[in-house]
């Protein structure tokens, strides 16, 4: 409006200079008559990549880039990952006992963590574009994979990895495929018609390796994916070096060696072979502990 004339605009990301679903943001700022734009980050998208800044400067707008860059990069990590690495940012969530178990030997797991931690998981889900599980978890747990208890919110996409799509067509995921987005990533030869008839979107990849799976999800527009299990999928993501953030909810009980581990075999023979995450934040949650870890860029899989 008129009050923008001569004002300073603060933006997280460089205003775009191309026509997408809306006209270029740089043009809108020029038309509004702002005198100065303070931008935390340049936009690495090849369609922008400095063009927005140059267009505003050519129009006589003073442009400053950099203030708040670290926080902006943290907040925009998913977008930056999809542009720079051609895959979404991956968060791995684990909820386990102090000795790394997710269930007793008999399979009992409800509930290891308390209600405060479980509510926090729903907030974590809401901060991601998609929730991802393996086919084994989908078959064993019949999960809904949704956000509950936080009001009427836009539900994340539910992603299930299953080479042959041998998933129950009468399960909760199938029954709600028309209401909450369900994406199925599968291998060659899987029968997709029954799932597509239910409203699911199917993606074929040569193999259920994290690299092609995440590339397909990134190409489909996802920027932030939260993996919630099971142990085999979690281990495969860690082995591939594609876990960017690791969030572990730990309860104050021990289940022993006979309990079910939160991870499958990682193939680690020497300490130097294990990815070493950096602690970002620890939060006490009414008797449980939430620890957030980040993988330094030099520890990730090159090119992934």
Where in this protein do the model-derived segments appear?
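Zn2+-dependent cytidine deaminase-like catalytic core
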Residues: 1-71, 157, 183, 188, ...
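Active-site ligand-binding patch in enzyme domains
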Residues: 2, 81-223, 232-235, 299, ...
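Residue-level signal for inorganic ion chemistry
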Residues: 16, 56, 100, 134, ...
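Residues at the N-termini of beta-strands
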Residues: 36-37, 130, 224, 244-245
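Short, acidic/turn-prone active-site loops that include or flank metal/cofactor-
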Residues: 41-45, 68, 163-165, 187-189, ...
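Conserved histidine-centered catalytic loops in small-molecule metabolism enzymes
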Residues: 189, 265-304
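Helical hairpin unit composed of two closely spaced alpha helices linked by a short loop
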Residues: 222-225, 229, 234, 239-240, ...
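Flexible, gly/pro- and Lys/Arg-enriched active-site loops
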Residues: 239-277
């Amino acid at each position: 409006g008129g009050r923008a004339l001569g004002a300073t605009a603060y933006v997280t990301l460089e205003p775009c200079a191309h026509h997408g679903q809306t006209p270029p943001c740089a043009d809108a700022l020029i038309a509004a008559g702002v005198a100065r734009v303070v931008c935390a980050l340049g936009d690495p998208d090849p369609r922008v990549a400095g063009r927005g800044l140059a267009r505003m400067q050519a129009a006589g707008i003073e442009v400053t880039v950099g203030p708040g860059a670290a926080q902006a990069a943290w907040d925009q990590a998913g977008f930056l990952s999809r542009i720079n690495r051609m895959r979404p940012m991956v968060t791995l969530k684990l909820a386990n006992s102090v000795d790394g178990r997710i269930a007793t030997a008999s399979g009992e797991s409800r509930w290891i963590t308390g209600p405060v931690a479980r509510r926090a998981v729903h907030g974590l889900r809401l901060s991601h574009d998609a929730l991802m599980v393996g086919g084994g978890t989908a078959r064993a747990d019949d999960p809904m994979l949704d956000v509950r208890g936080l009001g009427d919110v836009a539900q994340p996409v539910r992603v299930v990895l299953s080479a042959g799509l041998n998933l129950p067509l009468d399960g909760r995921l199938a029954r709600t495929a028309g209401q909450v987005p369900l994406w199925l990533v599968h291998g060659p030869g899987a029968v997709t018609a029954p799932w597509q008839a239910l409203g699911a979107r199917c993606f074929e990849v040569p193999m259920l390796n994290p690299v092609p799976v995440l590339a397909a999800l990134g190409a489909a527009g996802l920027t932030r994916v939260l993996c919630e299990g099971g142990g085999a999928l979690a281990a495969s993501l860690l082995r591939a070096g594609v876990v960017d953030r690791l969030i572990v909810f730990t309860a104050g009980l021990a289940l022993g060696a006979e309990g079910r581990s939160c991870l499958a075999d990682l193939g680690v023979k020497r300490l130097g072979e294990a990815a070493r995450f950096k602690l970002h934040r620890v939060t006490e949650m009414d008797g449980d502990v939430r620890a957030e870890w980040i993988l330094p860029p030099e520890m990730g899989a090159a090119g992934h």
